[in-house]
Amino acid sequence: MFYMEFILSLIGSLLLIICVLVSVAFLTLLERKVLGYIQIRKGPNKVGLMGIPQPFCDAIKLFTKEQTYPLLSNYLSYYISPIFSLFLSLFVWMCMPFFVKLYSFNLGGLFFLCCTSLGVYTVMIAGWSSNSNYALLGGLRAVAQTISYEVSLALILLSFVFLIGSYNMMYFFYYQIYIWFLIILFPMALVWLTISLAETNRTPFDFAEGESELVSGFNVEYSSGGFALIFMAEYASILFMSMLFCVIFLGCDVFNLLFYVKLTFISFVFIWARGTLPRFRYDKLMYLAWKCFLSFSLNYLLFFIGFKILLFSFL
């Protein structure tokens, strides 16, 4: 019986990973199409019908190119960091709330925080092991940025833990049957979305990949497979952050088709931000993290703690 359950959960995990990777492929196509229409041009439209097979052609091109590595780089860490980056981006999907018994995490929120904290190391090691000044600067920027915004991210998640009384993601579904958290906590949703942009190194917070300053940033020395893996990890984390936003703020009804429409819309917002917003200034980025978001999330945390104490004192 145990073996049967184990095999079923293994098949479920494999299906989840395959679906995430296919979603990543089509998210890149969506991004290129949307950016094309924002810049008043058509996106990829030559390959197949309306350019739909384009991501698969890109994948074939990237993985069949010659794999080069810099002579002065640290060979092992240079190769392992993109693989570990993609592994973490796929591993964090385990805390997606399932109704069926695939994984039922009582500490899903904590698991998510652990995985995002580990994601810092991959960028740092990728930047350092390339042995290039540009890559190192990009890596250091990414580390400073991610650590700064992770504090506010953890505090906001902790506020929700106090509110719903559990780290389990399924509790978000029970508490949002009648009203979404987005409606009653709109400022918090905006801050969470901004932090998600910073955590995934997206515009306007793409300092790790500042082309105008750092010649592509921490992944400047990566070609073919290594670059593709970093790219896939970034887009998998964008999809995950979109999914998490839907779970926390937009009603966590995973079996409803509308949940995936909402997820697609939030992913579209990430792309929309890239097409419309210019890059932020680095000092303003740090001021935003430590002076605005930290005080905001701390105030909300104290408010929720006070609210629960008040509630229990009257019960």
Curated annotation (Swiss-Prot):
Keyword Hydrolase included in the entry's annotation: no
InterPro entries the record matches: NADH_UbQ_OxRdtase_su1/FPO (IPR001694), NADH_UbQ_OxRdtase_su1_CS (IPR018086)
Transmembrane segments: 6-26, 80-100, 107-127, 153-173, 177-197, 229-249, 253-273, 292-312
GO terms under biological process: aerobic respiration
Designated name of the protein: NADH-ubiquinone oxidoreductase chain 1
Keyword set includes NAD: yes
Catalysis performed (reactions): a ubiquinone + NADH + 5 H(+)(in) = a ubiquinol + NAD(+) + 4 H(+)(out)
Record membrane topology: Multi-pass membrane protein
Role played: Core subunit of the mitochondrial membrane respiratory chain NADH dehydrogenase (Complex I) that is believed to belong to the minimal assembly required for catalysis. Complex I functions in the transfer of electrons from NADH to the respiratory chain. The immediate electron acceptor for the enzyme is believed to be ubiquinone.
Family: Belongs to the complex I subunit 1 family.
EC number: 7.1.1.2
Cellular localization per UniProt: Mitochondrion inner membrane
Pfam families named in the record: NADHdh
GO molecular function, one term: NADH dehydrogenase (ubiquinone) activity
